[in-house]
Amino acid sequence: MLPEEDLKIIRKELGREPTLVEQGCFLNLWSEHCSYRSSAPLLKTFTSTGENVLIGPGDDAAIIKFEDGYVLAIGMESHNHPSYVDPYNGAATGIGGIVRDIISMGARPIALMDPLYFGPLDTPKNLFLFEQIIKGIAGYGNCIGVPVVNGETFFDRRYSGNPLVNVVAVGLCKEENVTTSRSQKAENKLILAGSSTGKDGLGGASFASRDLSESAEAEDRPSVQVGDPYTEKLVMEMTLEAIEKGYVKSCKDLGAAGLGGASSELAAKGGLGARIIADAVPQREPNMNAYEILLAESQERMLFEVAPEDVDAVLALVQKYDLNGAVVGYLTKEPTYTVEFGGEIVADIPIAFLTGGAPTCEKPSEAPTLREEGKKPETPEDLKVAFLKVLSSYNIASKEWIYRQYDHEVQLRTVVKPGEDSGVLRITGTKGIALTCGCQPRATLLDPYNGGKTAIIENSMNLAVKGAEPLAIVNCLNFGNPERPETYWQFENAVLGLGDEARKLSIPVVGGNVSLYNESDEFKTAIPPTPSIGMIGKVDLEIPLPSGFFAKDGDSIILVGETTPEMGGSEYYACMDSGNAGMVPAVPENAPELIKAIIEAVKSGKLSSAHDLSLGGIGAGLARMCRSMGAKVDLSELAGETQADELLFSEAPARALLAISEPEAVREILKDVPHAVIGKVGGETLEIKGKNFELSVSLKEIAEAYGSLTRFMMG
């Protein structure tokens, strides 16, 4: 039901009581999910322009200039609530929706990433959600032939009952084929093409704009869409062919609010109105009413604006691909949104009011009571036990069980496969892109502003170790109930942190999604603030890319960046049951210089290996690089007054490990940033020495700890 405050505004504008169909349109298009009514003022603080940005926020996806006449389409979406209610279909249709966003811009999807967040797997419900969500992503992505090349998987008890499924998609096309969702000309026809329209997904947009109740699995299942990847593949090919032949004047995929959302937004963006003939829509079920036809979120559907003379050609294309298609309306000069059904007018709304009239506001924001730092844990007597415990944490352990279910090599562009800091794809002969995603939710929980900044730095470093120059950022801003002042304060400060650090690095934030009300009645939890981002960069493939693992016996190991003792939000503190203690490490002022230096070091072509340091710090980073060969490392010179566990597990941002046969070859590049040669690659063990500790772990022990998640899931 529409809130009474909204109804008052609507009655005043219309001068009458809205019809049932009109109420449905407003309920969905004025929902938080569609209108960003709580977040719009904050989103405007992002810098979204740049020399390579052709289309920024506001369309189905952003368009970034690449090379040789090619452009990249990039978008990011969430499908959180549906993935709790029906995890397989919720995750699958999350993939389908973001892929259609890319297609609607005229681009062929070439890559996916999936930042995912779950509750602990020792709870049967969380384990079920985890398994089904991964299956849903794999089942849909593999069938449509788009590789999943990178991702993040993070576990925390606060995601119990409210997993987060975020998806990034990237597409490629020639600049002349870019299509937008801005309508072009009155009297042009609106063609609905793809799957037929059923009753699935009704109210999906409004469902995504409230907390999950204990009865959500039963009550909200009709709000979850059901996907068909084989139809999606046909829709993809049909749409791209129609665009390449010049038939499509504007295009929008049908997602939130279904035909009602797509047709009204497309028309309004071009300053036009629309008249929809609901009876003309190809229907999957008998006796559907106008409300259902207009607002169902059935998947695999696209809306095209087509000139009258091209209608027959487009419908012939639709038939060629064995899809459903029909003219369902037309654009009008009058700026109204009119829906006809059964010969009667069931909706007649000023279109700008429908698509842009939702009242936006900044919610009350209140900082929480100042948190006590708490007591840091004593340094463990047996450091090796702590080391292996951290390494076997599912947040750090190998995610091989996940990405082995994905086809990450389809389309034959993949240069760097999943399991490294970033995925790399070949675009043209010598140019490629690097892709990375994620954030650090525990750091953002303790310090939202610094957590937002850290997300930008962490992803920038993931690109840097592959020599990639950042091009653009997209985001999924996942938070709890914004009506709680403390939650809105978290949201506000995380957004400001993201924006400030992105500006400092001159990376535009070109699009994304806001997902609020992520709270679970069943588990009595609210998610930690999760400003998940996707980042894309340009890579020169003429230069040999360093491996994320030690690759050459005898290489010198260089640590770049400063290690600080702040441990707040760290995986080590979580493993030691001190999760709320400590201060979050600050992003260093010289982070841009550190990132630039690492990029230049990689571009020198001299590095054998390079790896960003994040969760688990130096200890976990070294262990991860010891996949097939060991290392001897001496951290004594770095220690100062730092405790052994802080030295090993600090997650101070903007640090990396480099391996090179001749360190002098990059000394000039690194001369203006903190760095030190800390050891050599070789042997069958990882040996780490500090001022007052020595640690020796065999490659077998490392492999066993690092394989904990795979072993559990295969168990």
From Swiss-Prot:
- So where does Mg(2+) 1 get bound? 77, 513
Predominant subcellular localization, coarse grouping: cytoplasm
Enumerate the GO terms in the molecular function aspect. Answer: ATP binding; magnesium ion binding; phosphoribosylformylglycinamidine synthase activity
Q: What are the subcellular locations of this protein?
A: Cytoplasm
Q: Name one GO cellular component term.
A: cytoplasm
- Keywords of this protein's UniProt record, alphabetized? ATP-binding, Cytoplasm, Ligase, Magnesium, Metal-binding, Nucleotide-binding, Purine biosynthesis
Which positions are annotated as binding Mg(2+) 2?
A: 101, 253
Q: Which InterPro entries match?
A: PRibForGlyAmidine_synth_PurL (IPR010074), PurL_linker (IPR041609), PurM-like_C_dom (IPR010918), PurM-like_C_sf (IPR036676), PurM-like_N (IPR016188), PurM-like_N_sf (IPR036921)
Which Enzyme Commission numbers does its entry carry? 6.3.5.3
Q: Does the keyword Ion transport apply?
A: no
If you read the UniProt record, what top EC class would you report for this enzyme, in one word?
A: ligase
- Catalytic activities: N(2)-formyl-N(1)-(5-phospho-beta-D-ribosyl)glycinamide + L-glutamine + ATP + H2O = 2-formamido-N(1)-(5-O-phospho-beta-D-ribosyl)acetamidine + L-glutamate + ADP + phosphate + H(+)
Q: At which positions is substrate bound?
A: 78-81, 100, 225, 297-299, 515
Q: Does the keyword Transmembrane apply?
A: no
Q: Where is the active site?
A: 33, 79
* Gene Ontology terms: biological process: 'de novo' IMP biosynthetic process; purine nucleotide biosynthetic process
Name the pathway. Answer: Purine metabolism; IMP biosynthesis via de novo pathway; 5-amino-1-(5-phospho-D-ribosyl)imidazole from N(2)-formyl-N(1)-(5-phospho-D-ribosyl)glycinamide: step 1/2
Which residues of the sequence carry a binding annotation for ATP? Answer: 36, 475, 512
In this entry, which stretches build a coiled coil?
A: none
Summary of the function given for this chain in its UniProt record? Part of the phosphoribosylformylglycinamidine synthase complex involved in the purines biosynthetic pathway. Catalyzes the ATP-dependent conversion of formylglycinamide ribonucleotide (FGAR) and glutamine to yield formylglycinamidine ribonucleotide (FGAM) and glutamate. The FGAM synthase complex is composed of three subunits. PurQ produces an ammonia molecule by converting glutamine to glutamate. PurL transfers the ammonia molecule to FGAR to form FGAM in an ATP-dependent manner.
Q: Which family does it belong to?
A: Belongs to the FGAMS family.
Its quaternary organisation is: Monomer. Part of the FGAM synthase complex composed of 1 PurL, 1 PurQ and 2 PurS subunits.
Question: Which named protein is this?
Answer: Phosphoribosylformylglycinamidine synthase subunit PurL
* Source organism per UniProt: Methanosarcina acetivorans (strain ATCC 35395 / DSM 2834 / JCM 12185 / C2A)
Q: What is the lineage of its organism?
A: Archaea, Methanobacteriati, Methanobacteriota, Stenosarchaea group, Methanomicrobia
